[in-house]
Amino acid sequence: MTRLFNDPNDFPEEARLGLVAAHRDKLMAVPGGVVRSTRSQPDSVAVVVGGGSGHYPTFAGLVGQGLAHGAVMGNLFCSPSAQQVYSVAKAANNGGGVLLSFGNYAGDVLHFGEARERLIADGIPCEIVLVTDDVASAPLAELDKRRGIAGDLTVFKAAAAAAEKGLSLEEVVQVAKEANRCTRSFGVAFEGCTLPGAADS
């Protein structure tokens, strides 16, 4: 495996800042993640996505015109904190409310949910749409327990397109939910992941 990093402990932060440095015309670093460096329409919905680092180009690579307005990035394979989510969402807010969308994982549900409560307390309308596309993680009778993996992209893109069109927060939520309802995926890995600084598995 090819490795491009300095200190393994600094890998997520260096990857984030490196991506921003390479794409200053599109991205801006904020505490906890990245937001668009370009202007969005005033009073439009901001779509904020996120999750653990290590699944590149997700999540920062999904920020830009026609995609998300911001991405929250936790540590490697770890949910971002509620403070990180709150910070990125505040920076991405255009005045039309915020849609938080992410894969259905316990840590993400907890932390994004807490951040949503803080945003609402600040007077910022905020809704959540979980991505639940992974058919291997739960049976059809337990759709709400399915994880979100590759289907993230479909849901994020649909929500972002609705926001770009000027739809309201409620309408963007409905578009995202419908995209999630229509999306299924099945992941296959040929070998295990390799963490920075760890020996190949």
PLM ranges: what are they?
Residues 2, 45-52, 68-71, 97-106, ...:
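Short glycine-rich or small-residue beta-strand-to-loop segments that form or flank ligand, phosphate
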Residues 52-57, 103-111, 147-152:
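Gly/Ser/Thr-rich loops at beta-strand to alpha-helix junctions
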Residues 42-50, 59-72, 136-139:
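Gly-rich Lys/Arg/Thr-decorated short loops/hinges at beta-loop-alpha junctions or inter-strand turns
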Residues 56-59, 83-86, 107-113, 136-139:
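Short glycine/serine/threonine-rich phosphate/pyrophosphate-binding segments
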Residues 1-47, 198-201:
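N-terminal amphipathic/basic leader segments beginning at the initiator methionine
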Residues 71-76, 120-145:
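Short, acidic/small-residue loops that bind anionic groups at enzyme active sites
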Residues 55, 64-95:
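Glycine-rich oxoanion-binding loops at beta->alpha junctions
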